[in-house]
Amino acid sequence: MSGWDEGAVFYSDQAQFPRGGPGGDPSADLTRHSALRKFKEFLRGFTGPTGDFPYRESLVHNRDHVTVAIEDLDAFDAELSDKIRKSPADYLPLFETAASEVLASLRSKVAGETGEMEEPATGDVQIFLSSKENCLSMRSIGADYMSKLVKIAGITIAASRVKAKATHVTLLCKNCRSVKTVPCRPGLGGAIVPRSCDHVPQPGEEPCPLDPWIAVPDKSKYVDLQTLKLQENPEDVPTGELPRNMLLSVDRHLVQTIVPGTRLTVIGIYSVYQASANQKGAVGVKQPYIRVVGLEQSRDANSNGPSNFTLDEEMEFKEFAQRPDAYVKICSMIGPSIYGHSDVKKAIACLLFGGSKKRLPDGVRLRGDIHVLLLGDPSTAKSQFLKFVEKTAPIAVYTSGKGSSAAGLTASVIRDGSSREFYLEGGAMVLADGGVVCIDEFDKMRPEDRVAIHEAMEQQTISIAKAGITTVLNSRTSVLAAANPIAGRYDDLKTAQDNIDLQTTILSRFDLIFIVKDVRMYDQDKRIASHIIKVHASGAAASSKNTDASEGENWLKRYIEYCRVTCKPRLSEKAAEMLQNKYVEIRQKMRQQAHETGRAAAIPITVRQLEAIIRLSESLAKMRLTSVATPEHVEEAFRLFNVSTVDAARSGINEHLNLSPDIANEIKQAEAQIKRRMGIGSHISERRLIDELNRMGMNESIVRRALLIMHQRDEVEYKRERHVIVRKA
């Protein structure tokens, strides 16, 4: 411990240069003073491609932080850049000291030239690093990267509250009352507190005991510190593997700049901190984390980080967009192994490209993402479409309705085991921000869980007010959902209301709703069987063509990404006028249908559906990289809307019309028997009620029709998955 007693100057130099400089490795050819001088020269004298001084100007304007590109440092001094990469913890403090001194000299120079008073110093300057190097995989970072600069990409799933981290701790001796200040290691490291006091006792004075120090919080120096949890991007996780997480530590001006769900590219120092002392062998086991020294958010919510397209790619994309069959070609790439369903494929293509987001003058945001619901019989390739979109969309998260809770879809509040504080952890809708959420078995979700995504689908935000945390998270995502009808298969003898067990509030949020039926037709069954047999028979041969298929998927993914980043179409005047007339016409037809049938459609046609057609038109224009949506795009959007949502709303509407007098009389008799059998508030099994009325000579179809009509009049209700009937007042 004698080296500790020689003073703060020795300790400071030792902490920053344990392997070099004076008293260190004699082979080191870059000392503390020469490194400081070179950093100053770099900040003062580095010139950009246009001859300006980017870092000098950045220091004058920002005053508290400056972002330095490692490539610029490479061009200025390769040795200095290499030291930053290999020993960032030693050289970054020097870099920040140099920045503070350069800023002070620049400000005094400006004050001398202008005659104005020099503004007071705002504190130390923080250095942010940036790099164009490729990111490392989270799985490849090991002990070889310890204390070196690393660059990784991922998605933020949790953010802690801001804490105060001590940079220098003031210690007070309990015996002699002497004061000592010791530095703290940056990041999650602590302070090294000496065990003995520096005070030399006078003759006859009692010496200070061991461990006499107590911390004085009021006299210590602090900075803001926040911890983040970074998870691998979903598209980077190998099949069957759990995503890896990495703890991040951000401080000072990087605090409170990131919310859960944000996609990040992080540059930081791979470090370790002490594991819990309660664990066995904790002294030798350290937990890894990254001390962030630079981060870059995704450039666009709809793109996976800053996308760099080559000139050849851009030329190829623009040439493809000019082809007259571009729309048909794109749709043929959607689910190539799935036979038929051409309109569903076109709708999914529109979902992948999306419409244009808009921000109104009053601050209201209008979503550009398209939601599609596939409702229909089993074995109609609904889940296959969802799996294809998960692989093709630039950002996608796949989940199943039965295994998804409200917190798992939106966000949850987790209590940290060590600090016992609460922090947010984003769910599927937050993690897929800027992409697509694929929800299978949508009808199997609990109603209270399904309600949780209402706000996420329309306002594209998720509001949290739990455990003292009140915040709003972004959820700018499209939803592709697949569901089965109530009875498992779609019953053509029932109305849409009786086949679709979803509330109007959730149905109105879907732009397109397709009822996918397994139609039993000889010719079609033969063609489908032939296609499936070919797919299975060519499975072995197709393995050699997998490369071509994957290249096609990658090309489509890149093209979708390029269109979403570069093209933001708007409606032309003619298209807007045509849209207005057609929407009024559809509303008139729906009013007429409601008047004829005496009840509203199961799937409403509201202003949301008008906005859906606008988004579809913009998406069709985006596929062709055109900046204006024309009447042709509106025409195709209306055709898709008619074959999906409008047909679903009209399905089964003639079922209860034109009943013969005999059947109408039998239905009335069945209603009377049901009311006589069931008192108000009583309940009975549907199967038992039908069997009892059968024994009285009534046909089962007549009894079911009577129950259906009574349910529509709200005289009875179904419970326990429609197995139990309850008589209402």
Curated annotation (Swiss-Prot):
ATP binds at residues 376-383. One of its GO terms (cellular component) is MCM complex. Residues 326-532 form the MCM domain. It catalyses: ATP + H2O = ADP + phosphate + H(+). Its main location: nucleus. InterPro entries: MCM, MCM5, MCM5_C, MCM_CS, MCM_dom, MCM_lid, MCM_N, MCM_OB. A motif (Arginine finger) lies at residues 508-511. Its EC number is 3.6.4.12. It holds the Pfam family MCM_lid. PROSITE patterns: MCM_1 (PS00847), MCM_2 (PS50051). SMART domains: MCM. GO terms for molecular function: ATP binding; ATP hydrolysis activity; DNA replication origin binding; helicase activity; single-stranded DNA binding. Probable component of the MCM2-7 complex (MCM complex) that may function as a DNA helicase and which is essential to undergo a single round of replication initiation and elongation per cell cycle in eukaryotic cells. Belongs to the MCM family. Component of the minichromosome maintenance (MCM) complex, a heterotetramer composed of MCM2, MCM3, MCM4, MCM5, MCM6 and MCM7. This is DNA replication licensing factor MCM5. It comes from Oryza sativa subsp. japonica. The lineage of its organism: Eukaryota, Viridiplantae, Streptophyta, Embryophyta, Tracheophyta.
